[in-house]
A protein has these predicted regions:
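Conserved tyrosine-mediated DNA breakage-rejoining catalytic core shared by Y-recombinases
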Residues: 27-64
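Basic, Lys/Arg- and aromatic-enriched nucleic-acid-binding interface segment
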Residues: 1-18, 22
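Active-site/catalytic core of tyrosine-dependent DNA strand-transfer enzymes
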Residues: 57-128
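Short functional hotspots where side chains directly engage DNA or cofactors
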Residues: 40-44, 113, 138-170
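Alpha-helix termini
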Residues: 2, 33-38, 101-106, 129-137
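Short, cationic motifs built from Arg/Lys/His that form the positively charged side of catalytic pockets
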Residues: 7, 21, 52, 64-65, ...
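C-terminal catalytic core of tyrosine-transesterase DNA break-rejoin enzymes
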Residues: 13, 118-153, 157
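Alpha-helix N-cap/N′ positions at the starts of helices
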Residues: 3-7, 117, 138
Length: 170
């Protein structure tokens, strides 16, 4: 399936395990990845130019190293020089559409999407924070920060799969 598509693997891992938006992934260059590997966290510029730093796990680090080996220094990691960014994004989205049934959770009837991976990250991160002793309010604000959102109502959309009484309501 994606055996040699380390670019796609990395983008999917960044959504699933770090909550990055698709455009944030496709802006990443080699210098950003080198710093992320040193700091175990990636700094991205999100919507409205807001900068945030998100921790990366070992799966992301491994995928970053593999893609870094294939990318000339000073270049974008997920976009080749001869391809516009929007076309590279479309290729990833087509790949997801073509292979989503092979990787979909058996318990889910919803089709996998890139943005859906971000939702999964948010819900799991929230639950992890709660399990580690954070209050629902503190966990909600931490997930908001990690996603690059400030408004509680937007974060609530991401946390819709979490039980009603378990998340901060506006």
């Amino acid at each position: 399936m994606a055996i040699d598509r380390y670019d796609f693997i990395l983008a999917l891992y960044l959504a699933r395990y770090a909550g990055l938006r698709i455009h944030e992934c496709f802006r990443i260059d080699t210098a950003t990845v080198e710093r992320a590997l040193r700091e175990n966290a990636i700094t991205v510029k999100g919507k409205g130019g807001k900068v945030r730093t998100v921790p990366i796990n070992e799966q992301i680090a491994i995928a970053m190293r593999k893609q870094l080996e294939r990318t000339p220094r000073g270049h974008k990691l997920l976009v080749s020089d001869d391809m516009p960014t929007d076309r590279a994004i479309n290729h990833l989205q087509f790949f997801i559409m073509k292979h989503r049934d092979e990787v979909r959770d058996v318990d889910s009837d919803r089709p996998m999407t890139f943005h859906g991976l971000r939702h999964t990250y948010a819900a799991e991160k929230y639950q992890e924070l709660i399990n580690n002793g954070k209050s629902p309010l503190d966990a909600h604000f931490e997930v908001s920060r990690l996603l690059g959102h400030e408004r509680p109502d937007v974060t609530n959309i991401y946390l819709a799969s979490v039980g009603k009484g378990d998340k901060h309501e506006q």
